[in-house]
Every structure is written in C-alpha cells, then in structure tokens.
A protein has these predicted regions:
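Intrinsically disordered, low-complexity regulatory segments
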Residues: 1-219
Length: 219
C-alpha cells in the first residue's frame, strides 16, 4: 500500500502540473466532486469563474477515497460543483491556455486612470478581426514623464461614486502590469465575473502577477 500511495500521489501531482499548461482538465475516473478552497463568482453567462489561485477539485470514489485532484487556476470556468456526480473523461474546468485573465468581482462603470496614448498604452488592431485593443507599456520603455504613471481600471457606481470591494472599505481598482491587454472601453459597464484585462502567459511567467492585483490577502 505504501508504494501504491507514493505512485498515486506522484501521478496526481504530475496531472496537475500538466493541466496548468493545457486549456482545461478532465476527470480520469467516475466519482463525486469535492472542492478544496475553490472560490467562484457567477458571470453574466451564469458560469462559475474561479477567483482564487489555490483552488483544487478532487474526485472521490464510492468508498470515499480521493482518486485524483487538480489545480484550478484563477480565471478558470468551473464546470462542476461540490457533490456533483461525474463520469470518466468529463471536463471539470476550462481556461485560456495563452493568457491569465484579471476578473472583476464587482459590477460597475469602469474608468481608466493613467491611460495615456503612446505613453502608458499602445493601441493594436487585430489583422483578422479588426478589433482594437490597448496594451500596457513597460515603464522601462517610457520617457521620464510616463515612468511614474500606473495604469489602473477603477470601478464606479451609477452616481459616479467609487465602489468598494465587497465587505471592505477598499475602492475597487485593478492595477495593470506591463503587457496586459485591455479590450474594454472607458466608462463602459462591467458585470461580476467579466474579464478586465488579459496578461500573456510569457509575461505572467516572468513576474508574480498577484503583485498587480488587489485582494491578495483573500487569494
């Protein structure tokens, strides 16, 4: 039994690390879902969006043993919930393999702060779709005037007052790291679970993206 346990633990760990580079995770066995530290918000499509970085989903067999467990990255769409019966091969969660999203947990009107064309942001147009996005520039490449600017997306209510994160006195504002991609319009409306910005995987790997996000204590 000792050898078996070691092998299984290793296998689960391997599966979790492989899943991180994929665009989702599937159950290997039939069983019942058990969630570990999974915190979600429900988006406008009625999907559960993970807003923790430490959440995991396990699959329990009929004897109550956890047969497998997977890390669920921040921003993933969680397709199952605690107590659900799942089949072998069923998809448990999915995410964008190429970018890390910044998710809003608060609804409101967004306002861009320190967004300056050609200084803190560069505008790019997709050749195929024609959709224009803004990319946050690296402070190292900015002139002296832009070095101290910190692009932020802040949230306000219908009366133009800043909204706070739920249960806190902290204004809801999301600091954007270099290379973050923004597809929203200034003064547009966002709902809970919407993507505020996306950070390309390669730039996210090179720095701790939680440093640019609020609510770190909750994650």
């Amino acid at each position: 039994p000792g050898t078996q346990l070691t092998m299984r633990t290793f296998h689960v760990g391997g599966a979790a690390s492989r899943a991180a580079a994929a665009d989702g995770v599937d159950s290997r066995n039939a069983g019942t879902i058990r969630e570990h530290n999974v915190k979600t918000v429900v988006n406008r499509e009625k999907q559960r969006v993970a807003v923790t970085r430490t959440g995991e989903i396990g699959v329990i067999d009929a004897q109550g043993r956890e047969r497998e467990r997977y890390k669920i990255p921040y921003g993933a769409i969680v397709l199952v919930k605690e107590g659900d019966a799942v089949k072998a091969g069923q998809r448990l969660g999915k995410w964008d393999a190429h970018t890390h999203p910044i998710i809003t947990e608060i609804a409101g009107q967004i306002r861009f702060q320190d967004f300056e064309d050609g200084v803190t942001i560069a505008r790019e147009t997709d050749d195929v779709t024609g959709v224009q996005t803004m990319v946050i520039t690296d402070p190292k490449t900015r002139g002296s005037a832009g070095k101290d600017l910190k692009p932020v997306i802040a949230l306000f209510d219908a009366h133009g007052k800043p909204v706070n994160f739920a249960g806190t006195e902290i204004p809801a504002a999301y600091a954007l790291p270099p290379k973050a991609i923004v597809s929203l319009e200034d003064e547009g409306e966002v709902q809970v679970g919407d993507v505020i910005a996306r950070i390309p995987q390669e730039s996210a790997k090179s720095r701790d993206i939680t440093g640019g996000l609020p609510r770190v204590a909750d994650l």
